[in-house]
């Protein structure tokens, strides 16, 4: 029984020693998460950018009933311009996604660790009560 009680503080100190590498792994996880987030946002935004020129074409098509030849070449360059501007909008938005996602993940991890520690404490107290009785 004495050996078990001595082994419990060792595991408790191991939890504290493991808390620092977990914060390092969190930053690594945030970096990988942000990269995957960038890729997913590229795909979703490229779809929206392809839809937005199509919506611009519909009104111009309605107005171009008088002259199809003059406005058909004019409608093709604006979608290219929109794509370039959308790409320029990507760069300022990416750091905000990076910056916002990491603290949320850290808070969630801290909460999970606290719950695990509390569950272990409750189990230890329960075991000691049952042993003493």
Swiss-Prot record:
Segments of skewed composition (Polar residues): 1-33
Residues that coordinate or bind Zn(2+): 12, 16, 26, 30
Keyword terms of this UniProt record: Chromosome, Developmental protein, Differentiation, DNA-binding, Metal-binding, Nucleosome core, Nucleus, Phosphoprotein, Spermatogenesis, Zinc
Protein's cellular compartments: Nucleus; Nucleus, Nucleolus; Chromosome
GO molecular function, one term: DNA binding
Ranges annotated as biased composition (Basic residues): 79-93
Cellular component, GO, one term: nucleosome
Function: Plays a key role in the replacement of histones to protamine in the elongating spermatids of mammals. In condensing spermatids, loaded onto the nucleosomes, where it promotes the recruitment and processing of protamines, which are responsible for histone eviction.
Name the UniProt record assigns to this protein: Nuclear transition protein 2
Source organism per UniProt: Gorilla gorilla gorilla (Western lowland gorilla)
Gene: TNP2
């Amino acid at each position: 029984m004495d050996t078990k009680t001595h082994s419990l503080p060792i595991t408790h100190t191991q939890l504290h020693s493991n808390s620092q590498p977990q914060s390092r792994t969190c930053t690594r996880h945030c970096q990988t998460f942000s990269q995957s987030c960038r890729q997913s946002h590229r795909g979703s935004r490229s779809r929206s950018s392809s839809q937005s020129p199509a919506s611009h074409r519909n009104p111009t098509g309605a107005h171009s009933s008088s002259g199809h030849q003059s406005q058909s070449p004019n409608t093709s360059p604006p979608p290219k311009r929109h794509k370039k501007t959308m790409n320029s909008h990507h760069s300022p938005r990416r750091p905000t996604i990076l910056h916002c996602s990491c603290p949320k993940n850290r808070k969630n991890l801290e909460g999970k660790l606290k719950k695990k520690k509390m569950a272990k404490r409750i189990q230890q107290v329960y075991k000691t009560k049952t042993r003493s009785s």
